[in-house]
């Protein structure tokens, strides 16, 4: 037995084979970090223990090829395959450089005799891959299979759930520590850096996001500004724990929280709780979205939403819970509910919680106290 074994945590071959048959696909070729990791265990994510395989993906791309009988082939750089390591796949194709990788794939495709077959690829599949297939294999067709992989990854295994819960606890610990240093005068870049440091110190293997805002400032960018008195601070953080992500938001206020802000926040938290309570097997994304809009209307609120949340896993927002989604909830899915409305001169106020869909009632994974913290 090898000293180090890398295996997928949630990949269900039988479910994949069934979905491939339903769609009439004979084989699939995966090239994105999330799906290669998901089907092979190859640690190519930015949140892997060593993210070098992700950083070098332009020179050493990686692929997972899965046939209709469930046979999984990993194609990867030889440098990652040397030594006392093992991957839980059926076959490995290796190469030394990008040119050799292209040649290896070409020969592999020819040996597999893909002529006249339907090959499934992701929408993000590199152009040179489809060109190789068309030039050397003459498949009957190339089909986009994002829907297959998204549906597979949506339902988490017990091992994946443990990873997501650990990632969530890491962020909650980091937020508890951050609250102690949030004070008027601190710069936003400094607070962002402190958030990263604390997530790593609490066990994160990577950073998902550090979406921190002061008042009405743009939270999506790190902007040089200093925190003032009587400002609302949004701490929206996500950690990666060996590729599995979290997404949590809590608020701090530099002063006494205005009564109207406090009551509006409590109202939004109640709406999030009500939507969270509806996360049961069989519930639809469309139905949840419509329910949220009705609650906004009932309470005289303006909705600042294009969705009511998202599933989470190897990506922060895997599938939206929106009016245009066909998602139907199943046990094992992990869903973030996040809802916001406006306050004052443009401040966004609301809440975000993470839930696990079970056979009966949803389980809230997030545990941090909800009220706005005064400092």
Model regions and ranges:
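Active-site neighborhoods and metal-handling regions in enzymes and metal-associated proteins
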Residues: 1-375
């Amino acid at each position: 037995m090898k000293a180090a074994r890398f295996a997928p945590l949630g990949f269900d071959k039988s479910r994949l084979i069934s979905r491939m048959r339903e769609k009439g696909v004979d084989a699939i070729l995966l090239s994105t970090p999330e799906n290669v990791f998901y089907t092979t265990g190859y640690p190519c994510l930015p949140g892997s223990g060593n993210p070098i395989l992700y950083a070098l993906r332009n020179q050493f791309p990686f692929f997972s090829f899965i046939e209709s009988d469930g046979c999984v082939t990993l194609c990867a750089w030889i440098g990652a395959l040397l030594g006392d390591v093992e991957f839980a796949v059926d076959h490995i194709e290796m190469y030394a450089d990008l040119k050799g990788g292209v040649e290896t794939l070409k020969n592999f495709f020819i040996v597999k005799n893909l002529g006249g077959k339907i090959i499934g690829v992701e929408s993000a599949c590199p152009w040179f891959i489809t060109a190789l297939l068309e030039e050397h294999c003459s498949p009957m067709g190339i089909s986009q299979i994002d829907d297959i992989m998204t549906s597979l990854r949506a339902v988490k295994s017990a091992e994946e759930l443990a990873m997501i819960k650990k990632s969530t606890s890491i962020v909650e610990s980091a937020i508890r520590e951050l609250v102690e240093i949030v004070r008027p005068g601190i710069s936003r870049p400094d607070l962002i850096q402190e958030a990263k440091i604390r997530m790593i110190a609490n066990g994160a293997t990577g950073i998902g996001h550090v979406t921190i805002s002061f008042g009405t400032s743009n939270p999506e960018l790190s902007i040089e500004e200093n925190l003032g008195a009587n400002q609302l601070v949004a701490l929206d953080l996500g950690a990666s724990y060996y590729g599995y992500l979290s997404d949590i938001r809590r608020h701090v206020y530099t002063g006494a929280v205005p009564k109207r802000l406090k009551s509006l926040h409590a109202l939004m938290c109640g709406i999030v709780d009500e939507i969270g309570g509806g996360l049961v097997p069989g519930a639809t994304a469309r139905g949840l979205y419509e329910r949220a809009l009705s609650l906004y209307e009932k309470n005289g609120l303006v909705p600042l939403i294009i969705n009511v949340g998202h599933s989470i896993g190897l990506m922060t927002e895997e599938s939206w819970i929106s009016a245009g989604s066909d998602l139907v909830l199943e046990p094992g899915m992990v869903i973030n509910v996040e809802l916001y409305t406006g306050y004052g001169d443009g401040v966004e106020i609301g809440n975000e919680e993470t839930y696990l869909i079970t056979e009966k009632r949803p389980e809230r994974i997030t545990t941090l106290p909800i009220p706005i913290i005064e400092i």
